[in-house]
Design a protein with these regions (language model features):
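Histidine-centered, transition-metal-coordinating active-site segments
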Residues: 1-79, 83-89, 96-98, 118, ...
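Short coil/turn segments at secondary-structure boundaries
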Residues: 69-77, 90-91, 106-113, 126-129
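Aspartate-rich (DDxxD/NDxxD/DxxxD) Mg2+/diphosphate-binding motifs
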Residues: 99-127, 135
């Protein structure tokens, strides 16, 4: 049995003053006794990791192509990549690693099937009931839909973990001048870093782009220069893998340099005081400009590629059709969502049901409900 006072003492030694300390948690909606050897945020992390919604991320594509192959990234693999980068940032900056990991594991739990086009379709279909946001739906999942405990609905996560996700769900409503806690900021940064680097990787793997095309971008040229200086000329496959690693390392290193410098000014202050001061962890101006160039290029060359646009149009048709059919015949939904339809507007209950589906299950439901003998979208 571990004395939790020693756990708090260990945090006091390892974490910076501006990190979120376990001893300062505001607790849970449903009070629970402390765990024998895990702090509150470690428990949150484990509850998210073992949730049904988290496991379903393995069946949702990161960038929807219709091809669920061994290589392709899913929301689950992306989430683990984000968590890995976020933990590195947290450890280096002496922030709370358990809280950071919990936030990273939760950040994509609310994503619907079919990638971002799935979110766009649900947003349109649900506009009369407030639209759809995967960040907001993640909170619905962990507070209501997950049913793992007899005493309450949801996972009963700590206030800080829920508040961190709430910031992501309501960014436009965030009070000006006050910044999110630092653990939230580095998860956002890790998500963006992983997203850009791995979209480059996937685009190269699928043949949508070549390294020569990418080399016109400043941040890619810089990464390639670093690789050649250290390793010389590499075969194409090794060069692609090295490029992804170097893009991540460049961005992480830049963020840490800026963060370490800014955090010197708040040494000794609490997490609340740092938020009140509005301190934000960002990339340097130079790298931020290069990242904007990269993201703009990827948007035009990859996300709007005619091959992917055709698949997404088919996916959008399927999801929109399912939404309409289930609104007309909600009795086709499982019991718990039929019950939700009695408590909520029917569009919200249908949207929640669809948002929880994997890509393959959505295809299956489309075939069953429309009685259309179509194959997977990879065949389009």
């Amino acid at each position: 049995m571990i004395d939790l006072r020693r756990y708090a003492d260990r945090e006091h030694l390892l974490l910076a003053s501006y990190a979120m300390h376990s001893r300062d948690t505001r607790g849970r909606a449903h009070p629970e006794p402390p765990h024998a050897y895990r702090g509150p945020f470690a428990r949150d992390r484990d509850r998210i990791l073992h949730s049904s919604a988290f496991r379903r991320l393995s069946g949702k594509m990161q960038v929807f192509t219709g091809e669920m192959g061994i290589y392709h990234r899913t929301r689950l693999t992306h989430t683990f990549e984000v968590a890995s980068i976020a933990r590195t940032l947290a450890r280096t900056l002496r922030l709370n690693e358990d809280l950071t990991e919990a936030l990273a594991l939760m950040h994509d739990v609310g994503h619907p099937p079919y990638g971002h086009c799935g979110e766009d379709v649900l947003g349109e279909c649900m506009q009369d009931v407030g639209g759809f946001s995967h960040n907001g739906f993640a909170l619905v999942i962990v507070q209501q839909l997950e049913q793992r405990y007899p005493q309450f609905n949801g996972l009963n996560l700590s206030y800080e973990t829920l508040a961190g996700q709430d910031v992501r769900a309501h960014k436009a409503e965030a009070s000006r001048g006050r910044s999110p806690m630092l653990e939230v900021q580095i998860v956002d940064a890790a998500d963006s870093i992983a997203y850009d680097a791995h979209d480059v990787d996937d685009a190269l793997q699928m043949g949508l782009l070549s390294i020569d095309e990418l080399a016109q971008l400043a941040v890619v040229r810089r990464a390639l220069d670093q690789i050649r200086a250290r390793r010389g000329i590499l075969p194409t496959q090794q060069l692609r893998q090295s490029l992804v690693h170097e893009l991540i390392d460049l961005q992480v290193s830049d963020l840490l340099r800026v963060a370490i410098e800014r955090l010197r000014s708040v040494e000794g202050r609490s997490t609340e005081e740092v938020s009140d001061a509005g301190l934000r962890l960002t990339h340097s101006d130079a790298l931020a400009e290069e990242r904007t160039e990269l993201e703009s290029f990827l948007f035009d060359a990859v996300y709007r590629h005619e091959r992917l646009m055709a698949v997404r149009a088919a996916a959008a048709l399927r999801l929109r059709t399912l939404f309409e059919k289930l609104n007309e015949t909600p009795e086709r939904m499982p019991l718990r969502f039929r019950q939700r339809a009695k408590e909520l507007p029917i569009q919200m209950a249908v949207g929640e049901y669809l948002a929880g589906m994997t890509d393959a299950f959505c295809d299956q439901q489309y075939r069953q409900i429309t009685e259309t003998p179509v194959g997977p979208l990879a065949d389009w």
